[in-house]
Each structure stands twice: as C-alpha cells, then as structure tokens.
Amino acid sequence: MSTKPEITITYCTQCQWLLRAAWLAQELLSTFSDDLGKVSLQPGTGGVFRITCDDVQIWERKADGGFPEAKVLKQRVRDVIDPQRDLGHNDRATPEAN
C-alpha cells in the first residue's frame, strides 16, 4: 500500500503568517480531502513561507514573488499528486476585466 502525499506549510511566526498558512491548509484539505495523508503547519522564522509536498517544493514566497492564490496553489499541488485530475472551476480561465 502506498502512502498518501503529505503537505507541509512552513510559515514565519515573526511575520504572523499563521492565519494565512492555516487558511491555505484548509483550502487544500477541502479540495484534496481523500488524496492527502496530512497537511501540517510548521513554524519558522526569517520571513519563510514555503509549501512542500513530500519534500518537493510547491511554493516559496521569495522565489515565487509573494503568496499563492488558492487557485494557483491547488493547481500546483494537483500537478504533483494527480496531474490528470480536473479541478473544476479552479481549472477554468478567468475572464479578463475590461
């Protein structure tokens, strides 16, 4: 039996990013509830905000230029754990504002 993927969200406690990390964890658990083994929050310092899936980096605040939108994060996680999965409205293009 293979184990389910595990997500770790490392967030800066000095920057008070716990609520942002918890919200993204909830978004991932809502979307991938049956596909993930665990989503954990790991306190850090020094402005860190990193999301990994089984040690594969999904998002890193400095490298990716800020924080992820939930839609983009879900797409990146999906691309790692189940690339063929349709995310429904999260995979639809957003119309450009005029």
Language model regions located:
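Domain-level signature for proteins that mediate thiol-based redox and metal-cofactor handling
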Residues: M1-N98
